[in-house]
Amino acid sequence: MAPPHPRDPSTAANYEQVTVSHYALKWKVDFEKKHIAGDVSITLDVKQDTERIVLDTRDLSVQSVALNLNGEPKKAGFTLEDNQALGQKLVITTESLKSGDRPVLEIKYESSNNAAALQFLTAEQTTDRVAPYLFSQCQAINARSIVPCMDTPSVKSTYEAEVCVPIGLTCLMSAIGQGSTPSECGKRTIFSFKQPVSIPSYLLAIVVGHLERKEISERCAVWAEPSQAEASFYEFAETEKILKVAEDVAGPYVWGRYDLVVLPATFPFGGMENPCLTFITPTLLAGDRSLVNVIAHEISHSWTGNLVTNFSWEHFWLNEGFTVFLERKIHGKMYGELERQFESESGYEEALVRTVNDVFGPDHEYTKLVQNLGNADPDDAFSSVPYEKGSALLFTIEQALGDNSRFEQFLRDYIQKYAYKTVSTEEWKEYLYDSFTDKKVILDNIDWNLWLHKAGLPPKPKYDSTPMQACKDLAAKWTTEGSEAPTDGEVFAKMSNSQKLAVLDAVRVNKTMFGDRMPALTATYKLDQAKNAELKFSWLMLGLETKWSPIVDASLAFALAVGRMKYCKPIYRSLFGWSATRDRAISQFKANIPNMHPITVKAIQSLLK
């Protein structure tokens, strides 16, 4: 029997005594003050007798707290106590609450004008330069900066919301829209939402902006600023097709709608799996649908992450490792098993190896699958490790068991068993053993301690390396001493985007043998003209790593234009580490801080410590 979940270290909430079943939000979005003001009614379930309720906050101004136990709200005393990197604890003293009580907390408050979850953009900072824009990013522990809450994945709740925004703007949330009405003053619009499926706090999300909607199917649409609407519709036209394949792999889709919204370039991630409304970076708008693998990833989160959720951020791999594995299962069904094998090997070699060896170092705590976060902000540990090391473990297990269809059925059963719940690594492992009692000897041969609790690289799974070898062979023509570099770019041009990336990665791995061939590589493969952001990023990184001075201006411009941390953090790391570019890069970064997302600012500032 798996042990009870240990306490989530990233929250101060007393969720062992009291839990939240529902949030009812009434918000007013103020673009001038750059904050959200309003109130929240929090329905509680008391599990153990208590005389206090503890919620997470960060930089909130709390005006009043009332507790409604028997239909009559009574003013409650409260204090805000510092909780270091985790914000402030809102400690509410109550009359004696008994197990089984269902009181409602009523809190009036407002966010600060630098809430960690929010980015307010002026009209000039948006793509169309027509109207201001707001979007949120609550993962991992930033929901507490826009609502007092139990900000832990261990607590799942439904929510409803009424959001008042300036007239002419559209509001979207991670919920099902219930329509809109004009405000009494006629200058604002009130949008209503309901999320009937219980979700963790990090999946609370809001967007407000000048947006246009394009229908993809009965349950899928894409939202974007009008100038990007057609391009977004073209890029993501296969969303319904991907969703249907995902249902074949993982089971029924329970969220009603699957909409996408293309955010401004400052959005710090590739995508964010907010229920009913996936947030997407505009860097995916390649014009040829070559980066829609991110959509398969975010769709997969509808089962692993959103439906079955890691109980704490120390077990983040249960969200992301499973989701990467499902994403590649979907691609295997759509494009063939060889493509799944290739993507899996690419993830191991291009992302995991580099993160472990070059970013953290092989002995670092954050290269473990199950991590000890202590009082650290979980964002500090964010990397490709839970994604790729987690996926590699599942690939290894599937391979060892030798029955892909049975392992796929296990995944569906696992999702069904833990749907609407949270799960620990020990619970998952116990369920794995219970599902394969006839394969215990095989499972026992897996070095669980090495995979789950040891730092560094795990053993590389046995992939079919046929497509990868073709990429390495082409790269070797650029990096083998005495070889003649290719002058014909046709072979490269005919490759898929993921194969092109593998070629450049293989060159980067062997860059010491690359010599002064950067100008020739750039010209032969027309890399300076790349519209695909992944390809352009790999080219820029190769140029920086080989200290090719003509790449500097393009690298600085890319880091300035793109807020996605996957790109700008490594670019700034390289620029900061090169004496010839350090001062210029620091100057650009500091000057651009007002235009950047706070999550991105914090991540890049950490490189300067």
Curated annotation (Swiss-Prot):
Belongs to the peptidase M1 family. Keywords: Aminopeptidase, Cytoplasm, Hydrolase, Metal-binding, Metalloprotease, Protease, Zinc. Coiled coil: none annotated. Gene3D superfamilies: 3.30.2010.30, Neutral Protease Domain 2, Peptidase M1, leukotriene A4 hydrolase/aminopeptidase C-terminal domain, tricorn interacting facor f3 domain. Binds 1 zinc ion per subunit. Its main location: cytoplasm. Aminopeptidase which preferentially removes N-terminal Arg and Lys residues from peptides and proteins. Despite its similarity to leukotriene hydrolases, AP-1 does not have leukotriene hydrolase activity. One of the mammalian leukotriene binding sites, 'Tyr-378', is replaced by a Phe residue in AP-1. Its cofactor is Zn(2+). The keyword Ubl conjugation does not apply. It comes from Caenorhabditis elegans. One of its GO terms (cellular component) is cytosol. This is Aminopeptidase ltah-1.1. GO terms for molecular function: aminopeptidase activity; epoxide hydrolase activity; metallopeptidase activity; zinc ion binding. It is found in: Cytoplasm. SMART domains: Leuk-A4-hydro_C (SM01263). GO terms for biological process: peptide catabolic process; proteolysis. It comes from the Eukaryota. Substrate binds at Q137, C138, Q139, P268, F269, G270, G271, M272, E273, R564, M565, K566. Zn(2+) binds at H297, H301, E320.
